[in-house]
Amino acid sequence: MAATMSEPRRVGFVGAGRMAEAIARGLIQAGKVEAKQVLASAPTDNNLCHFRALGCQTTHSNHEVLQNCPLVIFATKPQVLPTVLAEVAPIVTTEHIIVSVAAGISLSTMEGLLPPNTRVLRVSPNLPCVVQEGAMVMARGHHAGNDDAELLQNLLEACGQCIEVPESYVDIHTGLSGSGVAFVCTFSEALAEGAIKMGMPSGLAHRIAAQTLLGTAKMLQQEGKHPAQLRTDVLTPAGTTIHGLHALERGGFRAATMSAVEAATCRAKELSKK
């Protein structure tokens, strides 16, 4: 019988890097799965030690993970995922739910490497999953049903927000949210450096910049306002904010940000075609 949301689950990880650890940590801390019910594999002990510290089981055998876990999350590097899927394909059954968090590997590619009727889902996470504040999207393959999608979504919400989308949105999510973490960090750095230029100590400036981003994000989420409305709430005629915004517009801030998301998305689409 396939796993359902009410059944005990063993969750497997093939690949034990930072994203795999972040997801495992979120699942365990949220009580979605017991640490002893998590089994992770990797070629070496370099990353497995982090799983052991969580109380998880570890192995160097990918086959062992598939043999013991009905739900397996593949968190390998994208360039090695096809080889790994081909390796485990002989022991994949219709009882398995196969999940990939590797960028650039399409559902059709995974389905083509695995036995017919394999239930496959694809997840695009981002780095804040490490602190259980991730922004994730997921897409399902041809044979993954509603129960499979609900099960995975329920699990991953331990790591942040998880929304089911058409697969065509996954590469866009990579540009918006996967790469977007770096874009936001660049803005936070520049924000702080502006204050440093005006005489504020570096450590204080970076703390305030980060808190400003955090507080603004919470207001956008909790109040449900469009960013333009919240921005307008800060403006006063001839005040400091409108002068600062004018400087941003002169520098092409809005267009540069849109172009960054576009460039990252286009690159993600290129990688998906390889």
UniProtKB/Swiss-Prot annotation:
Catalytic activity: L-proline + NADP(+) = (S)-1-pyrroline-5-carboxylate + NADPH + 2 H(+); L-proline + NAD(+) = (S)-1-pyrroline-5-carboxylate + NADH + 2 H(+)
EC assignment: 1.5.1.2
Recorded metabolic or biological pathway in which this protein acts: Amino-acid biosynthesis; L-proline biosynthesis; L-proline from L-glutamate 5-semialdehyde: step 1/1
Record Gene3D superfamilies: NAD(P)-binding Rossmann-like Domain (3.40.50.720), ProC C-terminal domain-like (1.10.3730.10)
Keyword check for Amino-acid biosynthesis: yes
Keyword Kinase: no
GO biological process: cytidine deamination; L-proline biosynthetic process
Single GO MF annotation: cytidine deaminase activity
Record Pfam families: F420_oxidored (PF03807), P5CR_dimer (PF14748)
Cellular component terms (Gene Ontology): cytosol; intercellular bridge; mitotic spindle
Assembly, per entry: Homodecamer; composed of 5 homodimers.
HAMAP family per record: P5C_reductase
Similarity comment: Belongs to the pyrroline-5-carboxylate reductase family.
Protein name: Pyrroline-5-carboxylate reductase 3
